[in-house]
Amino acid sequence: MIDFRPFYQQIATTNLSAWLETLPLQLKQWEKTTHGDYAKWAKIVDFMPNSTACINLKDKVESIPHTPLSVGETKQLTHHLKQLMPWRKGPYHLHGIHIDTEWRSDFKWDRVLPHLAPLKDRTILDVGCGSGYHMWRMVGEGAKMVVGIDPTELFLCQFEVVRKLLGNDRRANLIPLGIEQMQPLAAFDTVFSMGVLYHRKSPLDHLSQLKAQLVKGGELVLETLVIDGDVNTCLVPADRYAKMKNVYFIPSIDCLINWLEKVGFKNVRCVDQAVTTLEEQRKTDWLENESLVDFLDPNDHSKTIEGYPAPKRAVILANA
């Protein structure tokens, strides 16, 4: 099983120390209600060697072992990594193995990074972090500490496997909770929420929860689905959106800016818009499920299969 005690020790003397009032008990309770396959996934983490490797986190997430793996070792490692499918966010280049994930998350990072306040020496929270790809890219930009939160047990095990293959780097940590379970810490210099807001039944509550984690003046990086329209435009899908049942609100950019200002954010601005392409989200050998092409109208890729506008994403920056 995953041992969170090193993280507790790590934050004990930082401005995150107040989290220790609630976090250990929350994670003990979490361990009692984990997914039925969690024990199997955690064993794969235990199997992974604590290897020494040359690490590149600046323009990709890559580990090159000082001693190259044999053909047999590569085959065995690939087998274990495949046991943790589906791999959704990446890609990873680990010990000579290319995990070609469903999402080219590096595309998103390249769109977001040029607009950010420098991440060097910052304490960062990544909400809905998935398997942690963007967390490692934040570390590559010099972040002092990156904490990701995501309640999905598979993502936790994927993250811990990657961590081991990156030499057990402790600058990034994944905590399997949702932001609604976090006490207001007001301790993070930058908070990321990318691909989360439209899954929330109460988007303004989510924005308020993000603000409660930021230091005064800290930067919010919000990436979410948007639609065209004015300040009063917001799509509420009747049932599914792109085959997803848990999509509740897709605002226009002006509507989203209004929401952010309403909960107290300042200096709110949109820095990027991009329609999701079939190059950025697609089926690979590391994903057995459907992907974007299956979610779009086969005769008109400007629409979802339900007839809504196809996914378009915006990046919004704001300050607490």
Curated annotation (Swiss-Prot):
Instruction: State the organism of origin.
Output: Actinobacillus pleuropneumoniae serotype 5b (strain L20)
Which family does the record claim for this protein?
Belongs to the class I-like SAM-binding methyltransferase superfamily. CmoB family.
Its job: Catalyzes carboxymethyl transfer from carboxy-S-adenosyl-L-methionine (Cx-SAM) to 5-hydroxyuridine (ho5U) to form 5-carboxymethoxyuridine (cmo5U) at position 34 in tRNAs.
Q: What is this protein called?
A: tRNA U34 carboxymethyltransferase
Binding of carboxy-S-adenosyl-L-methionine, residues: 89, 103, 108, 128, 150-152, 179-180, 194, 198, 313
Q: What does it catalyze?
A: carboxy-S-adenosyl-L-methionine + 5-hydroxyuridine(34) in tRNA = 5-carboxymethoxyuridine(34) in tRNA + S-adenosyl-L-homocysteine + H(+)
E.C. designation(s): 2.5.1.-
One of the record's GO molecular function terms: methyltransferase activity
Task: Give the enzyme's main class according to its UniProt record, as a single word.
Answer: transferase
Q: Which GO terms describe its biological process?
A: tRNA wobble uridine modification
Self-association or partners: how does it assemble?
Answer: Homotetramer.
High-level lineage: Bacteria, Pseudomonadati, Pseudomonadota, Gammaproteobacteria, Pasteurellales
Which UniProt keywords are given for this protein, alphabetically ordered? Transferase, tRNA processing
Domain of life according to the entry? Bacteria
